[in-house]
Amino acid sequence: MAKTPTRARKRVKKQVSDGIAHVHASFNNTIVTITDRQGNALSWATSGGSGFRGSRKSTPFAAQVAAERAGEIAKEYGVKNLEVMVKGPGPGRESSIRALNAAGFRITNITDVTPIPHNGCRPPKKRRV
């Protein structure tokens, strides 16, 4: 007895005009996530996922490419205005914001949301090179 094939419904992409770009810039990688106002992810990209590996992953150019890739997908949802939330001390902080601006988004607000401890965990020891 053969089953009748069930048709997969085509998902309709919701239209969002305002979004939030979360930029997580660590020393090793940069993650760019674009969400709607409620925090539901629309698109994301990373330096590592953009084809950079090893020490090249932690460069400003890799962060720029990641921001461009996340921005292209977010444009399909109709995002025009972005609020940018930057977290972390990495090298991709500024270049990812510049890339989003160059991609045609109107950046309305830039906020630094880097978590700062009130003397919490002991930090890692200093590097000796």
Swiss-Prot record:
Q: Which Gene3D superfamilies match?
A: Ribosomal protein S11
Give the record's GO CC terms. Answer: ribonucleoprotein complex; ribosome
What are the GO BP annotations of this UniProt entry? translation
Short name of any one Pfam family annotated for the protein: Ribosomal_S11
Q: Sorted alphabetically, which keywords does the UniProt record give? A: Ribonucleoprotein, Ribosomal protein, RNA-binding, rRNA-binding
Is Signal given among the entry's keywords?
Answer: no
GO MF terms listed in the record are: rRNA binding; structural constituent of ribosome
Q: Does the keyword Lipid metabolism apply?
A: no
**Can you tell me which family this protein belongs to?**
Belongs to the universal ribosomal protein uS11 family.
Q: What does this protein do?
A: Located on the platform of the 30S subunit, it bridges several disparate RNA helices of the 16S rRNA. Forms part of the Shine-Dalgarno cleft in the 70S ribosome.
Q: How does it assemble?
A: Part of the 30S ribosomal subunit. Interacts with proteins S7 and S18. Binds to IF-3.
Name by which UniProt lists this protein: Small ribosomal subunit protein uS11
The organism of origin for this protein: Aeromonas hydrophila subsp. hydrophila (strain ATCC 7966 / DSM 30187 / BCRC 13018 / CCUG 14551 / JCM 1027 / KCTC 2358 / NCIMB 9240 / NCTC 8049)
